[in-house]
């Protein structure tokens, strides 16, 4: 059967997008993998780099530390975010939008900023550590920030919004008819929670854990700022490449860093397919009932979460406009004088804005075209499946990983 003009155009666009994704994703990863089997001179040496890495006890400690930080941070963030999302979806408290927007604030800041704020708050000369600069000594609290404690706090703050978004959606689409049937049978709230609520959002829990794990596992900013001497894989990559100029070993660490992320991401994709068949058009939206004791608890809990988030941003804001934090808190704009640094802050902002704008336009266009071409076809071709896979692969990749080969 002869193809129509529209079908020919769609095939051409599909091949173009596939070629584009191959250039920006497959080629860098291919070069990265090839580099891991070479020495710094470019000679093929097989698995020697991997053997050297795994026989070094110090490098194995980094892997162990990374797995520990990722697991603990993911569990804590899920507990906090689920409780927060439950307060949004299953209570009758007021100001839900305010709580939600404040809880989402960390999403718009890098983990490096979170780490810097924590240093100003809980570092050796931090506001909380010194009892608010010895004005409230009774409130002084040293949490021993530098190391796993600081990394976990910074990572939880970073991944909290992403986990909250997933769990908030999962709770919002639970079928209310199940609760109505349970009420008719006289089921207690405790039993409804464990037999209806949790089973219905189990895929949300799995997805949120995997997202949190990947983001933490591949993050560089928080360990760099508050990690101290506590090594993780992301900082190992930086040390190998920038500090030691050992590109081959940096590629090895990058591959090791990539494997758990890809496995976790593939599991997440399988989970999402199962999640899509749980709900249907006949599902009813959950309608929470009034409960003063429950609502009071969530008012307190969500206020505490929001106060901590606000304190992080306020600390950064105040320190930026202070003459010399924490010794001289006099208002000053001298910290914004970048005129001696390669053109000044205007040039920095201009370059960042242009890069973000171009990336946003190109990324949005390519993503829309890819989604349109794939979803508008009744039968998916091999090219369509490859486009889908290559489009989601970057979500499982560390930010710096694809650039190691350069």
List where the protein language model places each region.
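Glycine-rich helix-loop "coupling/hinge" segments at transmembrane-helix boundaries
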Residues: 220-244, 326-329
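Membrane-water interface segments at the C-terminal ends of transmembrane alpha-helices
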Residues: 9-40, 55-172, 200-221, 252-269, ...
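Helix-loop-helix hairpin linking two adjacent transmembrane segments in secondary transporters
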Residues: 235-260
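Transmembrane helix boundary and interhelical loop/hinge segments in multi-pass membrane proteins
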Residues: 43-46, 167-180, 189, 202, ...
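Feature of multi-pass inner-membrane transport and sensor proteins
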Residues: 191, 228-234, 263-296, 327
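Short, Lys/Arg-rich, polar N-terminal cytosolic tail immediately upstream
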Residues: 1-6
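Conserved small/polar residues in nucleotide/adenosyl-binding loops
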Residues: 181-182, 404-406
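Glycine/proline-centered hinge or cleavage motifs at structural transition points of membrane proteins
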Residues: 185-187, 199
């Amino acid at each position: 059967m002869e193809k129509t003009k529209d079908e020919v155009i769609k095939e051409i666009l599909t091949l173009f997008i596939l070629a584009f994704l191959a250039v920006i994703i497959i080629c860098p990863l291919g070069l990265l993998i090839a580099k891991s089997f070479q020495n710094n001179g470019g000679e093929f040496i097989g698995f020697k780099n991997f053997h050297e890495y795994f026989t070094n006890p110090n490098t194995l400690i980094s892997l162990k530390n990374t797995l520990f930080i990722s697991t603990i941070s993911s569990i804590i963030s899920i507990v906090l975010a689920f409780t927060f999302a439950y307060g949004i979806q299953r209570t009758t408290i007021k100001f839900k939008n305010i709580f939600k927007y404040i809880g989402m604030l960390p999403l718009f800041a890098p983990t490096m900023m979170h780490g810097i704020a924590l240093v100003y708050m809980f570092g050796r000369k931090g506001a909380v550590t010194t009892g608010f600069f010895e004005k409230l000594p009774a409130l002084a609290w040293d949490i021993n920030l530098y190391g796993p404690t600081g990394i976990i706090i910074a990572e939880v703050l970073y991944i909290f919004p992403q986990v909250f978004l997933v769990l908030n959606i999962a709770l919002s689409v639970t079928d209310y008819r199940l609760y109505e049937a349970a009420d008719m049978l006289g089921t207690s709230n405790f039993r409804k929670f464990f037999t209806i609520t949790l089973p219905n959002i189990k895929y949300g829990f799995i997805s949120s854990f995997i997202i949190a794990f990947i983001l933490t596992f591949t993050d560089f900013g928080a360990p760099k700022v508050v990690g101290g001497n506590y090594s993780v894989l992301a900082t190992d990559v930086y040390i190998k490449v920038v500090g030691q100029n050992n590109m081959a070993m940096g590629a090895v660490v990058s591959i090791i860093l990539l494997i758990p992320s890809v496995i976790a991401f593939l599991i997440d994709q399988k989970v999402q397919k199962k999640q899509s068949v749980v709900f249907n058009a006949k599902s009813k939206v959950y309608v929470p009932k009034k409960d003063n004791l429950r609502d009071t608890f969530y008012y307190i809990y969500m206020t505490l979460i929001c106060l901590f988030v606000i304190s992080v941003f306020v600390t950064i804001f105040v320190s930026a406009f202070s003459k010399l934090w924490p010794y001289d808190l006099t208002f000053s704009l001298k910290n914004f004088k970048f005129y001696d640094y390669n053109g000044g802050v205007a040039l920095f902002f201009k370059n960042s804005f242009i890069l973000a704008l171009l990336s946003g336009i190109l990324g949005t266009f390519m993503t829309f075209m890819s989604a349109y071409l794939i979803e508008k076809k009744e039968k998916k071709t091999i090219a369509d499946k490859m486009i889908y896979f290559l489009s989601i692969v970057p979500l499982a990749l560390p930010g710096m990983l694809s650039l190691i080969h350069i």
